């Protein structure tokens, strides 16, 4: 989802820098843009689906909230095989999330529901609803969209909403995974490729534009990799209320 978005933005940037590029071919431009919009709309729609018969973030958060009784301090601290005794990081983190003092620790301490409520609220934003609504219309009236010419300027607002929706999803996923379920945290949102992202891209644009596109990629990549900053602090502010 995130990589697809950065890829589209970078290719669109490269096309804008090279007016003679084959990327301006109407068929290529239309197929690439419609593929991007359909993929983003469907992915965000699926990840934020609130129904109970699907796999999504809202479904996961509801399941976590209804089973918080199972995530006790003892389970949280010792699930990796570490001994329960000791004043190490898992204990301190649980203290902070549960709002308890270190001298009053109990094995059956639990994380309050309001922490999960906060994560759910991060998904309750207009941008997600608007992208989901737009996705419904895109799929229901696909033929109409296919007949329309592609105007990147016209969809820039939609791209901004897609980025906002992605950010909310990433932050919610990081919060529940790394801090509630005590799974590994993400060091980066965008994966580090072990190959050249722009291999043979000079077949579509000039070599100068390839170099510019490579630099352009770094900006949204850095921005997305910072999306998880402050997630834990936001949860702690909830625990303190």
Stretches with model-predicted labels:
Residues 1-126, 152-241:
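Amphipathic alpha-helical interface segments
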Residues 122-148:
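Histidine-centered, metal-coordinating catalytic motifs and their short helical/loop contexts
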């Amino acid at each position: 989802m995130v990589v697809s978005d950065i890829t589209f933005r970078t290719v669109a940037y490269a096309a804008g820098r090279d007016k003679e590029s084959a990327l301006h071919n109407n068929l290529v431009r239309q197929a690439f843009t419609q593929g991007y919009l359909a993929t983003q709309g469907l992915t965000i729609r699926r990840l934020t689906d609130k129904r109970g018969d699907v796999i999504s973030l809202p479904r996961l958060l509801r399941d976590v909230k209804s089973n918080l009784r199972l995530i006790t301090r003892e389970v949280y601290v010792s699930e990796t095989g570490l001994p329960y005794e000791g004043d190490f990081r898992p204990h301190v983190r649980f203290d902070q999330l549960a709002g308890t003092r270190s001298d009053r620790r109990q094995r059956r301490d639990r994380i309050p529901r309001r922490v999960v409520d906060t994560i759910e609220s991060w998904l309750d934003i207009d941008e997600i609803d608007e992208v989901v609504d737009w996705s419904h219309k895109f799929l229901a009236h696909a033929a109409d969209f296919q007949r329309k010419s592609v105007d990147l300027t016209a969809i820039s607002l939609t791209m901004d909403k897609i980025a906002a929706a992605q950010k909310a999803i990433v932050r919610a996923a990081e919060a529940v995974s790394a801090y509630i379920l005590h799974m590994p945290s993400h060091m980066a949102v965008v994966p580090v490729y072990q190959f050249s992202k722009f291999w043979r891209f000079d077949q579509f644009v000039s070599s100068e534009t390839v170099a510019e596109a490579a630099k352009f990629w770094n900006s949204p990549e850095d921005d997305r990799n910072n999306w998880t900053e402050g997630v834990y602090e936001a949860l702690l502010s909830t625990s303190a209320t």
